[in-house]
Amino acid sequence: VPELERLIQAHQNIVFFGGAGVSTESGIPDFRSVDGLYHQKFKYPPETMLSHTFYEQHTAEFFDFYRQKLIVHGAKPNAAHLRLAKLEREGKLKAVVTQNIDGLHQAAGSKTVYELHGSTLRNYCTRCGKFYPVSFIEEAGGKGDGVPRCTDCGGIVKPDVVLYEEGLDEAT
């Protein structure tokens, strides 16, 4: 840690690359550890349930799993998120590049965040493009088949996250 602090103090153009390990202290499990999603038992493997094909062919089951396992309630930014936001305010950190989909970097105050795999906080209609908050996905769980549908056109409202079999957003 002292060496890391020395490097931080000596440099002004830092970019942080991070993933699931950053948010585990906030109570968000990663995918691959012993307690992670991939080691839990489900009807299908998590990689299957989080694939584009599964989303298309088993939409209601996809959303049930998504609501239960990927939307996190009550998670707060931890010391790492807060330290990165502070470094950005100080002008040392130029960007955070993350694979996390939890929005905790922004909740901590980071402004320049590139979410390679998207965010559970953003959701959009696959037909008309209208955006919806995560609460819309949650509330749809208690209605009909549980599939969130656009209030304007009836299209499916999909989480703005990268599923298996999908490419990364080129804008990111």
Residue ranges and their predicted role:
Residues 1-172:
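Conserved catalytic core of sirtuin-type NAD+-dependent deacylases
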